[in-house]
């Protein structure tokens, strides 16, 4: 389901309730970020749906709260701490003309932080 650009805990809770109310069978939620996933966990618990026994949930971005929520959220760690300084450095180099790099794809490694919301 689409949340638009509202990627908050509240949006995750509302969208999950809409999905439950739709009657469409599902057994997992892959959320765009951890906040949406935490909202989903809240709504699943409020509806008596057991995680991970009846429903598995995974987020993306490994925010600090994910480890402390009950149950602790399985998430993807995108390892992107380096991206902002790299982007700023490339932009400043281009502005002052010291080094103009050709456009390129920059890739990163991501990995699963398995916690209690999936059966991995």
Predicted regions and their residues:
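Short acidic active-site motifs
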Residues: 11, 15
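Short beta-strand elements in bilobed, periplasmic/extracellular small-molecule ligand-binding domains
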Residues: 1-10
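Flexible loop/turn connectors
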Residues: 17-120
């Amino acid at each position: 389901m689409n949340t638009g650009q509202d990627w908050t805990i509240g949006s995750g809770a509302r969208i999950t309730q809409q999905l439950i109310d739709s009657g469409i069978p599902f057994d997992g939620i892959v959320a765009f970020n951890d906040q949406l996933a935490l909202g989903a966990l809240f709504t699943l618990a409020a509806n008596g749906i057991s995680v991970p026994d009846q429903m598995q949930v995974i987020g993306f971005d490994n925010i600090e709260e994910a480890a402390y929520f009950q149950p602790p959220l399985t998430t993807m760690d995108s390892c992107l701490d380096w991206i902002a300084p790299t982007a700023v450095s490339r932009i400043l180099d281009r502005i002052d003309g010291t080094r103009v790099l050709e456009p390129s794809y920059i890739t990163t490694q991501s990995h699963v932080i398995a916690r209690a919301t999936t059966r991995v």
